[in-house]
UniProtKB/Swiss-Prot annotation:
EC identifiers of the protein: 1.2.1.41
BP-aspect Gene Ontology terms: L-proline biosynthetic process
One Pfam family of this chain: Aldedh
Name assigned to this protein: Gamma-glutamyl phosphate reductase
Species of the source: Nitrosomonas eutropha (strain DSM 101675 / C91 / Nm57)
Catalysed reaction, written as an equation: L-glutamate 5-semialdehyde + phosphate + NADP(+) = L-glutamyl 5-phosphate + NADPH + H(+)
Molecular function via GO: glutamate-5-semialdehyde dehydrogenase activity; NADP binding
Gene this protein is translated from: proA
Functional note: Catalyzes the NADPH-dependent reduction of L-glutamate 5-phosphate into L-glutamate 5-semialdehyde and phosphate. The product spontaneously undergoes cyclization to form 1-pyrroline-5-carboxylate.
Main location: cytoplasm
Pathway: Amino-acid biosynthesis; L-proline biosynthesis; L-glutamate 5-semialdehyde from L-glutamate: step 2/2
EC primary class: oxidoreductase
Similarity remark: Belongs to the gamma-glutamyl phosphate reductase family.
Amino acid sequence: MEKNEKIHADMQALGRAACAAARIVAKADTATKNHALAMMARAIRRDEALLLAANAKDVAQARNKGLESAMIDRLTLTSRGVVSMATGLEQIATLPDPIGAMTDLDYRPSGIQVGKMRVPLGVIGIIYEARPNVTADAAGLCLKAGNAAILRGGSEAIQSNQAIAICVREGLRSAGLPEQTMQVVETTDRAAVSALITMSEYVDVIVPRGGKGLIERITNEARVPVIKHLDGVCHVYVDLSADLEKAVRVADNAKTQRYGTCNTMETLLVHTGIAEQFLPRICQIFLEKEVELRGDEAACALVSRMKPAVEEDWYAEYLAPILSVRIVADIDEAITHIATYGSQHTDTIVTENYSRARQFLREVDSSSVMVNASTRFADGFEYGLGAEIGISTDKLHARGPVGLEGLTSQKFIVLGDGHIRE
């Protein structure tokens, strides 16, 4: 059997096993699912040293291959990160179980009662690159939402993902649930991705997390619905009526708290009427933190160490200590810039003007739109969703951070007492 044929056969076997497991986990009660989550968390805490050792091997190989610093940052697990994975699973256990919830029940003139019931999606294929924590987060969220999952992590994190998967399977066994509820693809061959995204007979939805190239490929080739975002070109607009202290805090945090995340600010927009006061101050902070600044002509005139920006900079998701800066005439120009160059991820306005705040919330067409808050808050945990499986900039099926509810669907339910249609 040729290599690709074997990979295809192996993926088909994973798909069949996932479908069988999905039927079982969909019926699992809340206590069983929560017990599995607790046991996963316990195993992760217990095996911290093993997880860190596996991750250290992945990081060493990544450095030897010359991978970018942003990729290595996302790949690296710390003791704090291991604890965070376990805590995330425990927090998912505390979240309300959405499965079986009935809403919108109403009697119709015919006498029947019509409503909706929340149900699992089924089998979720999750494709991700360098973040080992996604293995635990995705397993926990998919389980609590009553789904089975097939997890395909990046080759750079294969040893970390396999070590975490051992803990996940232990938790499932402890709760009497099939280990096949959460399966990790063992091969790093890209043919496995092609097989996974075309198995419409087994997989109900694909959630990709990674670089633009990966997500574009999956979107173009998939025969299964995809929940995704391509880029995180996030903006902070500092309005004429902004409180400068708030603006400094928000802009600094949005850019420098962590460079390699999709909710990091990549472009700073500043109203021309406040630019002379604000830009030199905030840019001095950025320069002290070794952030490279690229600005339009007006911004460069105010900050001598700023490089001229080119057209590509406005579209760029740097994931690095680089920031684009533009001075705009008013809020309308800021909104137009975001509509032209943004990625519909997360954008914020800093302003003390209520009407302009409302205008920004209404007119900016992004999955998260904020007022006087850092873009770094665009996160399932910060939104009270628990760990997120990703952020969607699509408008169907889920939008924004995708937590438990985003991993479910609804079906209509009809209650009668021998009713017939006349």
